Amino acid sequence: LNELSFNFDKFVPNQNNILFQGVASVSTTGVLQVTKVTNTGIKRALYAAPIHAWDDDSETGKVASFATSFSFVVKEPPIQSRKADGVDGLAFFLAPANSQIPSGSSAGMFGLFCSSDYNSSNQIIAVEFDTYFGKAYNPWDPDFKHIGVDVNSIKSIKTVKWDWRNGDVANVVITYRAPTKSLTVSLSYPSDQTSNIVTASVDLKAILPEWVSVGFSAGVGNAAKFNHDILSWYFTSNLEPNNPAVNQAQ
């Protein structure tokens, strides 16, 4: 398939086109709960069908451009029940098809990585929305809550400060343009006119296998259990020639 699109305005319990790993689930109110206050550990939710990331069969060599948008809420528990600041965050990711949660990837590893090394065997591109930056536990993080672009490592290649708002709905748009190898992330809150934006150069074909899974992952520790809720999710991808000159000629 050269194109794939799906759209979830809301979710339903036992949704058959979402794969749940860990204890991720859908609430009776139609919210995809990647984590919730009563749980610790790692939770992931992936779209059930694989995505065609690139194709070498054509003369030009095709690589997928994609766009995704989703809304989510990160909400902290009452202060009297917390032992620390927010731990740890939420990530949108692309990984090998049928990817499983790696061992040793809890808490600040977001259920994606086993270490902070740039290991090409990971084959992961992720966008993290990180609410925790304690240097004692996450020495790779900047000294602020942030949005980061991760390539084969939890140590982001690009970050931008995230003005996180407890319990508010955040709207995210992520686009990837294959001809320019440009990944752009924008996060905004409906009540605000400003956006948090980060752009990074990412060679999708060099990082990912031909077929990938897309989804969300979150890790929480024992110190502070935050809710990470996905309210809606849209995704579309399209294979196109991996050559700007070819695209301009079409």
UniProtKB/Swiss-Prot annotation:
Coiled coil feature spans: none
InterPro entries with a match to the protein in the record: ConA-like_dom_sf, L-lectin, Lectin_LegA_CS, Lectin_legB_Mn/Ca_BS, Legume_lectin_dom, Leguminous_Lectin
Single annotated GO MF: metal ion binding
Glycosylation sites recorded in the entry for this protein: 119
Record's keyword annotation contains Calcium: yes
Keyword Isomerase applies: no
UniProt keyword list: Calcium, Glycoprotein, Lectin, Manganese, Metal-binding
Binding site for Ca(2+): 130, 132, 138, 141
Binding site for Mn(2+): 128, 130, 141, 146
Pfam entry (one): Lectin_legB
Signal peptide extent: none
Family recorded in the similarity comment: Belongs to the leguminous lectin family.
Function: Di-N-acetylchitobiose specific lectin.
Name the UniProt record assigns to this protein: Lectin 1
Lineage, top ranks: Eukaryota, Viridiplantae, Streptophyta, Embryophyta, Tracheophyta
